[in-house]
Amino acid sequence: MVFEGHLVGTGLKVGVVVGRFNEFITSKLLGGALDGLKRHGVEENDIDVAWVPGAFEIPLIAKKMANSGKYDAVITLGTVIRGATTHYDYVCNEVAKGVASLSLQTDIPVIFGVLTTETIEQAIERAGTKAGNKGYESAVAAIEMAHLSKHWA
């Protein structure tokens, strides 16, 4: 038997956690995510958005959302751009590990929509220009995973 999540978001409740750092990019990711959710049938009043200071703070609030019992899926959005120090490596690794572990801890799909790029140009491309919008893609993944997860609930 083959299982696939369908892409109709009607009736789903979705939490979104967005890092404010690099807000000119993360706001575009959020716009893409909201567009993706609404285009697939998620009602605006079934979407909650929490802004956090930066990417490093995303896992805690995503965990609290997932544990609240209110959401069928949680989307995480942020942007980390490499600088001149090793700070980038620490932030990227910890955020990725933190978000990745949440689905397993909470049994709620937690989608990783955090950009980790070498340059600001790469981030801009992934926030709605040449490379699509990773926020939109994260929204579609959240809908699909929410339905797949419910199959075994």
Curated annotation (Swiss-Prot):
Gene3D superfamilies according to UniProt: Lumazine/riboflavin synthase (3.40.50.960)
Pfam family, one: DMRL_synthase
Regulation: Activity is competitively inhibited by the bisubstrate-type compounds TS23, JC33 and JC72, with Ki values in the low nanomolar range.
Keywords: Riboflavin biosynthesis, Transferase
Residues annotated as binding 5-amino-6-(D-ribitylamino)uracil: 21, 55-57, 79-81, 112
HAMAP family: Lumazine_synth
Identification of the protein by name: 6,7-dimethyl-8-ribityllumazine synthase
Organism: Bacillus anthracis
